[in-house]
């Protein structure tokens, strides 16, 4: 399966925007391995400021800790690429921007940086909705770096859309 195109990301970002706008919700993002691709997909739609508050590209552990309040001990215990950190990033984004929802992604885009436990392509996508526990999914992609980033962004957008639909 091919990674999603920029047009596919934009379409899903627009669908998420429509769902958020219908509920009068706002969203924030915390992106590590995708480097802002989720925010880019969302803001390709005119009027995205109605529902997108902003995002943090938290590529380093220090950025995760200082900008989004992820505890240093959590990163030390589980690693930056983990379910626990993805959950904390989503919660931190929603808290920082005072939004109803935060989404996050952390992973290993490649081509280097993988390990036996966490191979290249391994990503965690998270969503946190105010008043509810964060939900995180693990995804494994087998594309080149850009393809892994696009696939992770698509997975995060879809998880957020599913979360909005589940709140109906």
Regions found by a protein language model. Give the residues of each.
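Short alpha-helical segments enriched in small residues
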Residues: 1-168
């Amino acid at each position: 399966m091919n990674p999603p195109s920029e047009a596919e990301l934009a379409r899903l970002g627009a669908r998420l925007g429509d769902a958020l706008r219908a509920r009068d919700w706002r969203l924030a993002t915390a992106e590590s391995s995708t480097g802002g691709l989720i925010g880019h997909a969302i803001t390709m739609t005119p009027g995205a400021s109605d529902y997108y508050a902003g995002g943090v590209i938290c590529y380093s552990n220090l950025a995760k800790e200082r900008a989004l309040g992820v505890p240093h001990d959590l990163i030390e215990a589980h690693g930056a690429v983990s379910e626990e950190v993805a959950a904390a990033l989503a919660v931190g984004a929603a808290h920082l921007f005072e939004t109803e929802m935060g989404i996050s992604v952390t992973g290993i885009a490649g081509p280097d940086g993988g390990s036996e436990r966490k191979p290249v392509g391994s990503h965690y996508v998270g969503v946190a909705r105010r008043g509810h526990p964060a939900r995180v999914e693990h995804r494994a992609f087998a594309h080149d770096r850009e393809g892994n980033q696009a696939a992770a962004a698509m997975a995060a957008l879809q998880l957020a859309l599913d979360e909005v639909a589940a709140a109906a």
